Amino acid sequence: KRDDGKDDRDENTNKKEFRAKCFDALGALSHIPGEDNSGKINTEKLEEWVQQAINLAEKKGCRNIVEYFIGKLLGHCQNGEDGIWPCEGVRDLVEDIHSKNMIEGMYIEKRNSRGVTSRSFGDGGAQEWRIVEQYQDWSRQLAITHPFVADELLGWLASSYKHEAEMWDDEHRLDMHL
């Protein structure tokens, strides 16, 4: 036992249980805090919720993973009024917080949200090239106002889809030679 009478094993068990409950709760969220039925986000409510979650996570020593789960949740947001994803409130928040963990969560969620794709013979990476162009365009449009989001999130998405497009193009070329 420690000098203060507490048992480290009990404290570690409690921390693990708390973390598991937090991750379950974050993983179970299906709507972004502050989001109404139309998908419009009350930025003040979202910022307050995120700050409270990060502050609590910081106290419990699990900020990185909580930021990641918050990012996964934010990855569900709609396009903004300007047509750019993520919406204005989310991109402002992520730009301010500057968390690579949050970016990673958003990236994973956005990639996973695409689901299964199918293609006709000869398509190659045409689908992915269109996605690359979209993310590159959005990244250019946000480069001045939201450089972190533009580069770290939209640039990463464009790069990963570019890699996938090249893979499908290579596969198509191989099929044509068989």
Kindly label every feature range from the protein language model.
Residues 124-136:
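Short amphipathic alpha-helical heptad-repeat segments
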Residues 159-175:
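Short, charge-rich amphipathic alpha-helical segments embedded
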Residues 63, 147-148:
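TPR-repeat structural position
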Residues 116-126:
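Short, charge/polar-rich alpha-helical segments
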Residues 150-159:
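Short, charged, amphipathic alpha-helical segments
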Residues 135-145:
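Extended, low-complexity, charged alpha-helical tracts
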Residues 1-113:
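Non-catalytic all-alpha helical scaffold/repeat segments
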